[in-house]
Structure formats: structure tokens, C-alpha cells
């Protein structure tokens, strides 16, 4: 365990094309093997496709998709007297954002379209319309928290 305490949070640099820190976060989530230019090409291509299909600002589409995917509750395992309970807890805003981006990227990778640009664009559009696997994941998370509501008093 480090003795200095937690590392300070570094501020996110705004993305050079859209001027949004959300786009920077998305690029960093797509990033594999340090290939940032490839990740940027994928994200910018997907946002451009989203602009062509909707005719609106792609950053607005991204924000709407994130709002539809962000969980407000999740379950955390808590051990009490030999039994492990799934305790529902509220999700902090930063974690909700991170989870939403992670789910969007993972479910985009699992899609069947030919290129990653198409997959990400379609997942973003589906999520912004309240459809898609990432929105279903959020609903499942909320359902799990709701069904374990009886253990909410074990929160810490």
C-alpha cells in the first residue's frame, strides 16, 4: 500500500476536434496497445457517422447516449457472518461516467458490423435512442440492485 496516499486526479484535456473532455475519455477507453491515433480515428469516424445519420451535433448524441447508459445504483458484495450479500449502493458520478463509457465500448466491440467505426457509431445511436446492449446492461444492474433492496441496510 502506498504511504503517500492516493495519486492526485489529473485534469482531462479537451479533445482537439470537438473540444469535449467526454470525447477524450472515449478515445482513452477505445485505446489498445498505446495506439492513440488509431483510437482517435475510430472515435472521430464513429462521431462523424453519427452526425451523418442524425444530422445533429455528435457530442450531443454522445452525451445523450451516456445519460441513457449511466447507472444510478449498483450492487457490491458485503460479507456478513459467513454469508456474502449483494448490497445495493449509489454510484458516484465519476464512476457512473466511467462505467457507461466502458459498457458502450465493450458492447460496441461485441457487435457484428464490419468495422469498429460502424460498431461504435451504431452502439452510440442505439444508446442515445434508449436501445442497445449497453442500455440493457444498465437496466440489468438496476434490476439487480432493486431485487437486493432488502440488504440495503448493510451499506457502509
Curated annotation (Swiss-Prot):
It comes from Nocardia farcinica (strain IFM 10152). Transmembrane segments: none annotated. Gene3D superfamilies: Ribosomal protein S7 domain. Signal peptide: none annotated. One of the primary rRNA binding proteins, it binds directly to 16S rRNA where it nucleates assembly of the head domain of the 30S subunit. Is located at the subunit interface close to the decoding center, probably blocks exit of the E-site tRNA. Part of the 30S ribosomal subunit. Contacts proteins S9 and S11. The lineage of its organism: Bacteria, Bacillati, Actinomycetota, Actinomycetes, Mycobacteriales. Belongs to the universal ribosomal protein uS7 family. This is Small ribosomal subunit protein uS7. It comes from the Bacteria. The gene is rpsG. Keywords: Ribonucleoprotein, Ribosomal protein, RNA-binding, rRNA-binding, tRNA-binding. GO terms for cellular component: small ribosomal subunit. GO terms for molecular function: rRNA binding; structural constituent of ribosome; tRNA binding. One of its GO terms (biological process) is translation. InterPro entries: Ribosomal_uS7, Ribosomal_uS7_bac/org-type, Ribosomal_uS7_CS, Ribosomal_uS7_dom, Ribosomal_uS7_dom_sf.
Amino acid at each position: 500500500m502506498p504511504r503517500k496516499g492516493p495519486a492526485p486526479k489529473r485534469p482531462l484535456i479537451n479533445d482537439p476536434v470537438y473540444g469535449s473532455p467526454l470525447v477524450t475519455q472515449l478515445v482513452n477507453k477505445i485505446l489498445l496497445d498505446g495506439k492513440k491515433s488509431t483510437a482517435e480515428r475510430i472515435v472521430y469516424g464513429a462521431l462523424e457517422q453519427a452526425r451523418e445519420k442524425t444530422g445533429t451535433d455528435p457530442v450531443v448524441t454522445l452525451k445523450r447516449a451516456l445519460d441513457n447508459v449511466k447507472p444510478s445504483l449498483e450492487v457490491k458484495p458485503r460479507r456478513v457472518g459467513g454469508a456474502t450479500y449483494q448490497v445495493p449502493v449509489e454510484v458516484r458520478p465519476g464512476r457512473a461516467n466511467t462505467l457507461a463509457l466502458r459498457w458502450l465500448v465493450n458492447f460496441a466491440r461485441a457487435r457484428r458490423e464490419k468495422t469498429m467505426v460502424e460498431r461504435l457509431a451504431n452502439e452510440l445511436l442505439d444508446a442515445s435512442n434508449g436501445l442497445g446492449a449497453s442500455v440493457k446492461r444498465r437496466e440489468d444492474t438496476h434490476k439487480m440492485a432493486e431485487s437486493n433492496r432488502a440488504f440495503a441496510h448493510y451499506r457502509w
